[in-house]
UniProtKB/Swiss-Prot annotation:
GO terms for cellular component: cytosol. GO terms for molecular function: carbohydrate derivative binding; glucose-6-phosphate isomerase activity; monosaccharide binding. The lineage of its organism: Bacteria, Pseudomonadati, Pseudomonadota, Gammaproteobacteria, Moraxellales. One of its GO terms (biological process) is gluconeogenesis. It catalyses: alpha-D-glucose 6-phosphate = beta-D-fructose 6-phosphate. Its EC number is 5.3.1.9. InterPro entries: G6P_Isomerase (IPR001672), G6P_Isomerase_C (IPR023096), Phosphoglucose_isomerase_CS (IPR018189), SIS_dom_sf (IPR046348), SIS_PGI_1 (IPR035476), SIS_PGI_2 (IPR035482). Its main location: cytoplasm. CDD domains: SIS_PGI_1 (cd05015), SIS_PGI_2 (cd05016). The active site is at 360 (proton donor), 391, 519. This is Glucose-6-phosphate isomerase.
Length: 555
């Protein structure tokens, strides 16, 4: 249990004190015993919504604990905070901004915020126009050749979300007049760019500079390198930059200075946080891959969850339940690491995306009022595609000393839709999908029940090093299939989970001040490494020593 709970005043009516008491009463209760006590546990601890099914019966909770968690949410005024989120209230208190990523997926006919909806759809329509032009082979480079490769240059929210979704929905790639490939570059060291550029032709390559501030050094250093690459091949003409770059940013003036043509500038707003921005024109690579209809389905899925989140009682509200279960595991069971385990290779980049979404949002230690937090905040979030992870770190999950909570994620169906082109080996692929599903179920069962999941006769002969303690809590999210609509739903679930937890912890999930100072210090060190400055006197001994090694001046 989190040590910070011990500091609370002994107000016996406080939901936190009641939850602490529940830990003391139920700490030795095993998941297998919870199922024995409640024959209808699966039905009682699962929710079906639209094309999603959420099973949390393998969590270490009881009906009483769930009621206390809901009471905690009410005590923290969660309903009022949800209403504030879905308004134009400046709930990003440290930056005095709204947090309106939900507005990016409003239907065009939405009447509650007509001006806001209009602004969003103007920019989306401008993006759709470019998508149609590129798909039709009508967008041409400086030499008149058709664009066949598009490279997204971004980092953080301008890379992780679009990259994750584009990879996950590759099966839904639309046909274009000429083959179109979408690539992603993010690392500031240039290694990705170096590997990619020799595969591309300058005449047929378009670059997206995706940066909310249009000032991120990682992104602009890569952009400057490709600009030099293009100008070396095609000449230093204005038309080269105007034809081969699209900008996505809040800063039109900076895009103008860089030379990007006005028609190739797609605008964001300050109220869109980077890690919440894939629904905006930051999602341009997604729309290029799955088409306008596919992108609109992605938005529709997220909007459906927005409606579910606002209008469903907490007891049946999936993002609220996900958040409260995380609070229970982290703050009361002292489980401070959480694994995301998708059993579908298309979700390869989901864990990395959720790491940013959760840890950059809720990795805070100061409350909204400027006081230190009273509870531990975000756990360490990590993960991998489940079948691969089984051969990497499941040993620790099953027999290690760390308590870990898990999310298992899987599509129910695959290889059965008309657009799939697997007819010649469909039967074998369906069998492989079933193999992945069977492993997903087996692992969650073994983590929960431990030895109870084993054959009794087998258990009698097993040495202790082959036995399983179990009692590792997990939830399972099943999607009818992995398509744009359902992926939009899945992402929005996690967005709102993060928000609910921020309310419980009384922190601001929409800033990221912790990442700012490191960038500034790097800018101070760069002139030293470049030889423009040699004063190391203000640096610590370790940094001085490392710089000397890097410069070949080690003593």
């Amino acid at each position: 249990m989190s040590k910070s709970i011990e500091q609370f005043p002994k107000d016996l009516s406080s939901p936190l004190i009641q939850l602490k008491s529940s830990v003391e009463k139920n700490s030795k209760l095993h998941i297998k015993e919870l199922f024995a006590l409640e024959p209808e546990r699966f039905q009682n601890y699962s929710v079906k919504f639209d094309q999603l099914f959420f099973d949390y019966s393998k969590q270490r909770i009881t009906k009483n604990i769930l009621e206390q968690l809901v009471a905690l949410a009410n005590n923290k005024q969660l309903t009022q905070w949800i209403n504030r989120l879905f308004s134009q209230d400046k709930i990003n208190c440290t930056e005095q901004r709204e947090a309106m990523h939900w507005a990016l997926r409003l239907p065009s006919e939405y009447s509650k915020f007509p001006e806001l909806t209009k602004q969003v759809h103007i920019q989306l329509q401008r993006m759709y126009t470019l998508v149609e032009k590129i798909h039709a082979g009508q967008y041409r480079g400086a030499t008149g050749e058709v664009i066949q490769d598009v490279v997204n240059i971004g980092v953080g929210g301008s890379d992780l979300g679009p990259h994750m979704v584009t990879h996950a929905l590759a099966d839904f790639k639309v046909k274009t007049a000429k083959p179109l490939n979408v690539h992603f570059v993010s690392t500031m060291d240039g290694s990705q760019l170096s590997d990619l550029l020799h595969q591309l032709r300058p005449e047929t390559t378009l670059f997206i500079i995706s940066s909310k501030s249009f000032g991120t050094i990682d992104t602009l250093s890569n952009a400057q390198t490709v600009r030099q690459w293009l100008e070396k091949a095609l000449g230093k003409h204005d038309r080269v930059v105007k034809s081969h770059f699209i900008g996505v940013s809040t800063k039109a003036e900076k895009m103008n200075e860089w030379g990007i043509a006005p028609d190739n500038q797609l605008l964001l707003w300050d109220w869109v946080g980077g890690r919440y921005s894939l629904w905006s024109c930051i999602g341009f690579p997604i729309a290029l891959t799955i088409g306008i209809d596919g992108f609109q389905q992605l938005l529709a899925g997220a909007h459906a969850v927005d409606e579910h989140f606002q209008n469903t009682s907490f007891e049946r509200n999936i993002p609220v339940l996900m958040a409260l279960l995380g609070i229970w595991n982290n703050n009361f069971l002292n489980i401070q690491t959480h694994a995301v385990l998708p059993y579908d290779g298309r979700l390869k980049y989901l864990a990395a995306y959720l790491q940013q979404l959760e840890m950059e949002s809720n990795g805070k230690s100061v409350q909204r009022d400027g006081q230190k937090v009273e509870l531990d905040t975000c756990p360490i979030v990590w993960g991998e595609v489940g079948p691969n992870a089984q051969h990497a770190f499941y040993q620790l999950l099953h027999q290690g000393t760390q308590a870990v909570s898990c999310d298992f994620i899987a599509p129910i169906q695959r290889y059965n839709a008309d657009h799939f082109t697997y007819v010649e080996n469909a039967e074998a692929l369906i069998e492989q999908h079933h193999l992945a599903l069977s492993n997903c179920l087996a692992q969650s069962r073994l983590l929960a029940f431990g030895n109870e999941a084993l054959d009794v006769k087998e258990l009698e002969k097993l040495p202790i090093y082959k036995q399983y303690e179990g009692n590792q809590p997990s939830s399972t999210l099943l999607l009818d299939e992995l398509n744009p609509y359902n992926l939009g739903m899945l992402i929005a679930l996690y967005e709102h989970k993060v928000f609910v937890q921020s309310v419980i912890w009384n922190i601001n999930p929409f800033d990221q001040w912790g990442v700012e100072k490191g960038k500034q210090i790097a800018n101070q060190l760069l002139p030293i490494l470049n030889g423009a400055q040699n004063d190391l006197s203000t640096l610590d001994a370790s940094t001085r020593g490392l710089i000397k090694i890097l410069l070949g001046k080690a003593e």
